[in-house]
Regions:
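Conserved P-loop NTPase motor cores
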Residues: 111-173
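P-loop NTPase catalytic phosphate-binding loop
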Residues: 1-34, 102-133, 137
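Helical/strand "switch-coupling" subdomains that flank nucleotide/phosphate-binding cores, especially
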Residues: 1-89
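Flexible, glycine/threonine-enriched loop-and-boundary segments that flank and lead into catalytic domains
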Residues: 68-110, 114-130, 161-162
Length: 173
């Protein structure tokens, strides 16, 4: 969801091929990270993997992937702003490993990005992923999420669907 939100605008349709290719790329990247502990788990590393390794892997397939099915150049160009030197390179490339899982009280202040059409959906997904991680991993501990500006998150179709998707595991936990 995060990669698709970074890449596509709210109006863009996401094809099964695009979703499948990103899923395959992510699996391959995680396998590579498991084998090579020197890879820093951040967006820069994933971007370089897509640019160098995955693009080469796509070129060597017996069944070609056409640009109209999955345009890796468009993906890389669009996501360049989150890569080293881009205007949002700070967002997904933290040098610190912050443990939100074991913090008893976490506040995300989103006032500065709530009107930013590019950043707000990304920040919302990161917050929701942090919360769902707590829900799944911290068994037997009472959890609460208060969303003060929920109306803002629900104002776009993609975010409304994502919040709906995230509610199912919360009800179970």
């Amino acid at each position: 969801t995060l990669l698709l939100t970074l890449w596509k605008s709210e109006d863009d349709r996401i094809s099964k091929t695009e979703s499948g290719e990103l899923g395959s790329a992510l699996s391959m990247f995680l396998d590579k990270m498991a084998k090579d502990r020197d890879i820093v788990p951040c967006f820069n590393s994933f971007y370089e993997f897509m640019r160098d390794d995955y693009r080469a892997e796509m070129a060597n397939r017996p069944i070609p992937i056409y640009k109209q099915d999955f345009d890796i150049d468009n993906f890389l160009t669009t996501l360049r702003q989150y890569y080293h030197g881009g205007r949002y390179d700070f967002l997904l490339n933290s040098k610190e490993n912050i443990d939100l899982l074991n913090k008893r009280f976490v506040v995300f202040e989103v006032d500065s990005v709530k009107d930013n059409k590019e950043l707000f959906p990304i920040v919302t997904i990161i917050i929701m992923e942090a919360f769902i991680n707590k829900m799944r991993r911290l068994k037997g501990i009472r959890k609460m999420m208060i969303v003060e500006e929920a109306w803002k998150a629900l104002s776009t179709a993609n975010m409304a669907e994502y919040l709906k998707y995230m509610c199912a595991p919360v009800k179970v936990a």
